[in-house]
């Protein structure tokens, strides 16, 4: 949308969920915030390394909820900044779920009903959802996806992470830094 506006085109975004998609809300941004905070915990707990610099620290404590709140605050700020930028540039945001309705048409389902829009060009940017292998059911507590993990609602003593892509590896780093034992399954 930003590129289209800068190229002189009129643009609109059909957005069913939070502005910013997967990266801003459940991926890149909150995971990097969790990595930064948990990385500080790991560094401060490495007493031997710190002593080599002449630094001595006592027990390192952290508030799990404050770390999660920090990530959430960063997400909210970026969502707001993105929304404000789009509004300032004249990009319309249509809240709802869009489906293609033929050539150059999108039908958007909202709480108020459906409306069809016509556009010269339509770009599909559906985002992503975590992959859950067939036969596995998530309950959000004992079996959960990265979408739940990003909230850092609890710290299990042991956690198995299925998938060693960048999200799995980042969560492995976060959870081990905060004291959890992690097993990676690929």
Give residue ranges: language-model regions.
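Glycine-rich flavin
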Residues: 3-9, 14-155
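Hydrophobic residues within alpha-helices
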Residues: 1-4, 171
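Rossmann-like NAD(P)H-binding beta-loop-alpha module
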Residues: 153-186
């Amino acid at each position: 949308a930003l590129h289209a506006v800068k190229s002189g085109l009129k643009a609109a975004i059909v957005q069913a969920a939070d502005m910013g998609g997967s990266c801003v809300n459940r991926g890149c941004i909150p995971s990097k915030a969790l990595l930064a905070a948990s990385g500080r915990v790991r560094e401060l707990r490495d007493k031997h390394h710190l002593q080599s610099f002449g630094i001595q620290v006592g027990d390192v404590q952290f508030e799990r909820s404050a770390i999660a709140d920090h990530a959430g605050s960063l997400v909210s700020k970026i969502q707001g900044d993105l929304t404000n930028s789009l509004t300032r540039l004249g990009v319309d945001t249509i809240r709802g779920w869009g489906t293609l309705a033929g050539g150059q048409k999108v039908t958007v389902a909202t709480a108020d009903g459906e409306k069809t829009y016509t556009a010269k060009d339509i770009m599909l940017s559906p985002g992503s959802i975590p992959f859950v292998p067939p036969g596995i059911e998530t309950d959000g507590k004992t079996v959960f996806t990265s979408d739940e993990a990003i909230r850092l609602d609890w710290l299990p003593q042991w956690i198995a992470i299925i998938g060693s892509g960048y999200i799995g590896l980042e969560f492995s780093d976060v959870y081990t830094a905060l004291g959890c034992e992690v097993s990676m399954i690929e």
